């Protein structure tokens, strides 16, 4: 007996699904290159917490374990004074920048920064136990310092990077919740902002919500949120704007092993152990943790102070800086030295040392230098390209002074002749639509390069490296006092006089 197949039949969609295409399909690259570099970028602050006076922050928090997110502002190439105007037709084309090379310079010596907590929740040493501690006292917190996980990181894109961390979730309405129950966890994806803390070895999580005792981790993160770049989410971005390419190097080992004081919320199942007697009748705390360490820092394993060239991005955006904006995210914990500053409390210190006569301070400094090579590109404004760009990012067309005609309205609108007349109802003026900042409310380190572009590549270190790598011949468009001899059409070859050697 014949039976139809039990397999499901998948019907294709009635309309074709729009396909994301690479920028190389509609962006034409020219042979014009520019070098741009920032000034020396410096930051100084307290490595553990900001210092506040009233409602004002007088010393910011500056740590070697923070994300540095640079928002690079580029000039509008459509308003640029180009050396060759024949490459661009303003009626049918628009110009964009493509980032093809960069170098992140890092100053300051290599060093290991430490952090700690004067009241860390450490109960017992479970690595080399001399005794079996069972009943912790009311407060067993101790002063512990440690070095963190070692991280070097560089993310480049034309949109802010995304980070992930674990936060406090929402419990279902039908579940009974009591004080002291473990809260549900939720994976949160958010934009990485300048000053956010990186994963230090204790996990990417919201410590303010998930550790209410403020004693389980060091001071600089006990009320902060440590984020880890969401590489999976950024790699899945259909347009590839958030991550052109990334560099990372991470290393860590566990230095010491401790356990926590406090009531264990989830007891060990009875089938996992045999009950003890006397001093082992009560099981000690099984909430174990380790202190991380990033180990040796060396100049042989540095990701910075060297050039990187972008030939093919990992996504569909091959380095095009939409909105004339570029984001460079940097983490470098190999230069996390915390400097101790000492100041005397008296104008004439005593001859013998007295500790109370001196005040001690902690400071951390950061030093950066950003260099870029940009390539000028053009886009032909066809109907298909404009429709695709509008679907991808409508603000791009708005910045190019393009707009879409609204669909026809079926209703009849009223327009009065005398708008200011008191005989008619009040006509409220229509306010001008202000341009909305897509990154309003987010904190970035803004670097303005609108006046830092130069076509003289051979005058800059990164430009000379680019010329050496690519063999591109630069042409000086405004070099005074340089003349070229006129070419001749003579067919007579130039002969050299042979010198007779003895």
UniProtKB/Swiss-Prot annotation:
Protein keywords: Capsid protein, Disulfide bond, Host nucleus, Host-virus interaction, Late protein, T=7 icosahedral capsid protein, Viral attachment to host cell, Viral penetration into host cytoplasm, Virion, Virus endocytosis by host, Virus entry into host cell
Keyword Disulfide bond annotated: yes
Gene Ontology CC: host cell nucleus; T=7 icosahedral viral capsid
Record-level Gene Ontology MF annotations: structural molecule activity
Residue ranges, annotated region (Disordered): 478-502
InterPro entries named in the record: Capsid_L1_Papillomavir, Capsid_L1_sf_Papillomavir, dsDNA_vir_gr_I_capsid
Cellular compartments annotated: Virion; Host nucleus
Gene3D superfamilies referenced in this protein's UniProt entry, alphabetically: Major capsid L1 (late) superfamily, Papillomavirus (2.60.175.20)
GO biological process: endocytosis involved in viral entry into host cell; virion attachment to host cell
Superkingdom of origin organism: Viruses
Keyword Disulfide bond on entry: yes
Function: Forms an icosahedral capsid with a T=7 symmetry and a 50 nm diameter. The capsid is composed of 72 pentamers linked to each other by disulfide bonds and associated with L2 proteins. Binds to heparan sulfate proteoglycans on cell surface of basal layer keratinocytes to provide initial virion attachment. This binding mediates a conformational change in the virus capsid that facilitates efficient infection. The virion enters the host cell via endocytosis. During virus trafficking, L1 protein dissociates from the viral DNA and the genomic DNA is released to the host nucleus.
Subunit structure: Self-assembles into homopentamers. The capsid has an icosahedral symmetry and consists of 72 capsomers, with each capsomer being a pentamer of L1. Interacts with the minor capsid protein L2; this interaction is necessary for viral genome encapsidation. Interacts with protein E2; this interaction enhances E2-dependent replication and transcription activation.
Family statement drawn from the similarity comment of this UniProt entry: Belongs to the papillomaviridae L1 protein family.
Name of this protein: Major capsid protein L1
UniProt organism field: Pygmy chimpanzee papillomavirus type 1
Gene label: L1
């Amino acid at each position: 007996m014949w039976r139809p197949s039990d397999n499901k039949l998948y019907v294709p969609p009635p309309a074709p699904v729009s396909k994301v295409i690479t920028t190389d399909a509609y962006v034409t690259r020219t042979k014009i290159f520019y070098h741009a570099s920032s000034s020396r970028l410096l930051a100084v602050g307290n490595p553990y917490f900001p210092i506040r006076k009233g409602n004002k922050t007088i010393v910011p928090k500056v740590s070697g374990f923070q994300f540095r997110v640079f928002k690079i502002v580029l000039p509008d190439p459509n308003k640029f004074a180009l050396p060759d105007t024949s490459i661009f037709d303003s009626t049918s084309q628009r110009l964009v920048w493509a980032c093809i090379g960069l170098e992140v310079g890092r100053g300051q010596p290599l060093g290991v920064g430490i952090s700690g907590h004067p009241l860390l929740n450490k109960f017992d040493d479970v690595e080399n136990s001399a005794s079996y501690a069972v009943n912790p006292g009311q407060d067993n917190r101790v002063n512990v310092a440690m070095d963190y996980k070692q991280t070097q990181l560089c993310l480049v894109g034309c949109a802010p990077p995304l980070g992930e961390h674990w936060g406090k979730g929402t419990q279902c309405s039908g579940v009974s919740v009591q004080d002291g129950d473990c809260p549900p966890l939720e994976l949160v994806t958010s934009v990485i902002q300048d000053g956010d803390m990186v994963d230090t070895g204790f996990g990417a999580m919201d410590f303010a919500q998930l550790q209410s005792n403020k004693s389980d981790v060091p001071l600089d993160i006990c009320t902060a949120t440590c984020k880890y770049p969401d590489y999976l989410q950024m790699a899945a971005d259909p347009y590839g704007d958030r991550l052109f390419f990334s560099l990372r190097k991470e290393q860590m080992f566990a230095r010491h092993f401790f356990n926590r004081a406090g009531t264990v919320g989830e007891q060990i199942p009875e089938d996992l152990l045999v009950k003890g007697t006397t001093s082992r009748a009560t099981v000690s705390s099984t909430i174990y943790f380790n202190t991380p360490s990033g180990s040796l820092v060396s100049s042989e394993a540095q990701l910075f102070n060297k050039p990187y060239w972008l030939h093919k991005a990992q996504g569909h955006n091959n380095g095009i800086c939409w909105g004339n904006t570029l984001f460079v995210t940097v983490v470098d914990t190999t230069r996390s030295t915390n400097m101790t500053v000492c100041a005397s409390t008296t104008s004439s210190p005593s001859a013998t040392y007295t500790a109370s006569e001196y005040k001690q301070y902690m400071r951390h400094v950061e030093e950066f230098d950003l260099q870029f090579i940009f390539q000028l590109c053009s886009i032909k404004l066809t109907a298909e390209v404009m429709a695709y760009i509008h679907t991808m990012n409508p603000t791009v067309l708005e910045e190019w002074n393009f707009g879409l005609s609204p669909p026809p309205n079926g209703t009849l609108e009223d327009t009065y002749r005398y708008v200011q007349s008191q005989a008619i109802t009040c006509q409220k003026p229509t306010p001008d639509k202000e341009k909305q900042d897509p990154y309003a409310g987010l904190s970035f380190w803004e670097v303005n390069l609108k006046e830092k572009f130069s076509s003289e590549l051979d005058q800059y270190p990164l430009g000379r490296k680019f010329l050496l790598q690519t063999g591109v011949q630069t042409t000086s468009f405004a070099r005074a006092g340089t003349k070229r001899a006129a070419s001749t059409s003579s067919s007579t070859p130039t002969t050299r006089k042979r010198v007779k050697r003895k």
